[in-house]
Amino acid sequence: MELAKRRGFIWPSAEIYGGVAGLIDYGPLGAQMKRRIEDVWRAFYVIREGFYEIECPTVGIEPIYVASGHVKGFSDKMVQCPHCEEYLRADHVAAANGCEGAAALSAEALSGALRTMPCSACGEELGEVKVFDFNLMFNTWIGPGSQRKGYLRPETAQGIFTDFPRLLRFYRDRLPFGAVQVGKSYRNEISPRQGMIRLREFTQAEAEIFVHPEGKKHPRFDRYAGYEVPLLGCAAQEGKGEPARMSMREAVEKGLVANEYVAYYIALTCDILVSIGVDPSRLRFRQHLTTERAHYAADCWD
């Protein structure tokens, strides 16, 4: 991180006023590199895949996020240290102290696990603490004197989803089709302490591909059918196994990956990362456990 700062890639935002965790400025080289990565991403999704790009506001009205489940469920489990009064992400503290599966634990179970663990800020034993949910969205009011509540978008997907009727007409009422968006998203992270890994404002590049529920065979699947990717499925995680390197065709045939569309875009994502210079030996795709998946997800990989 220090090298990146010295060379003009990134700097702490508002540094002359002390800065704030989770917000960064891209310096001259960082802004240039970021644009080049976005250009490569567009070369895959817009030029090669043929998806059109849209641009939506970063502020959305409350009904959008009520419908998407973000108002009710877009939260992390938080705890406050009784000694230094620092707010901490409870599952991260538990995981750092050897608690397996901390992300899937209930608030009550986390409270019990944290009892003998040290605070990651001051080092004191946490003791009896209450774990509670903290919603990660930034909220605001739209218009002067208005009672219309809004939020800074936590991801770019919602704009694409709310534009679906218009997009469907644009694509002449035919599935499948895709739409992409590159833009800022915002998450009020509890303790953004991992450099650029967990920011409060960040750029997302997102593609949403709409397919018929009964038509999940990708028309160009052969392009990536033989593409091999290390996959860490649910069963391997539960058995403490290692990622298994296999082709996308094999992953679909074995039922590890839900369908050809999911497999195609796992491979395409890997292809993009390798294209921008990421070492392929450092990549693996991990399947979300059933307890981690969003309510709408049949399959999900990171």
Language model features with spans:
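TRNA-recognition modules of translation machinery and tRNA-sensing kinases, especially anticodon-binding
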Residues: M1-D302
